[in-house]
Amino acid sequence: HYDDFCKAWLIECKRILKDNGSIWVIGSYHNIFRLGYHLQNLDYWLLNDVIWRKNNPMPNFRGTRFTNAHETLIWASKNKKSKYTFNYQSLKCLNDDLQMRSDWMLPICNGKERLKKNNGKKVHSTQKPESLLHRIILATTNKGDAIFDPFLGTGTTAVVAKKLGRKYYGIEKDKKYFKAAYDRISKTKIIEEDYLDTIENNRSKPRIPFGSLVELGIIKPGTV
């Protein structure tokens, strides 16, 4: 039944996904390989698998296995010919001007960001950190784009989308999660406008060999 369910929602996501859009799925060893299997069978085009390495993972208290210190994300376009968005330069700026790698060291959701009930218990057991969604959304969408999360949970995707000036849509059937998400999104404000503009990809600009600049007299030898 789980495989039928996964296949069904991935089909619907592909139906509404724009030709220049892309999809992200996340999971642990329990389900991510099955999701990847369905993505490929449905002719999504896999672009990257990304490892979210948690720098503060929960330990394996029984000591019977390795500590589960990462989750896997799969990024895919609608098909092989899709012209998807990838803000390469923006990611370099987040990474000390180095090309962003596919292994991301980010903390799990905790502190003030973690939603808790009055009794101190977590509202949602797998609430994702905003930093993770921030990187995904900044990397693969532009200001004004629409983002859809079919499993909204407590609203992290929508919160980050709103902060970054994106449109957001989501589905959540659990009433407790829905209320938490609604309250959280309502309190969220868009961040500084200047920050929302992605940095232009230099690869799209025409390039002139350095030697040609010297030959044309634009640059003199020894001045650079």
Question: What residues fall within each predicted segment?
Answer:
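Core catalytic lobe of class I
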Residues: 1-180, 221-224
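S-adenosyl-L-methionine
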Residues: 183-222
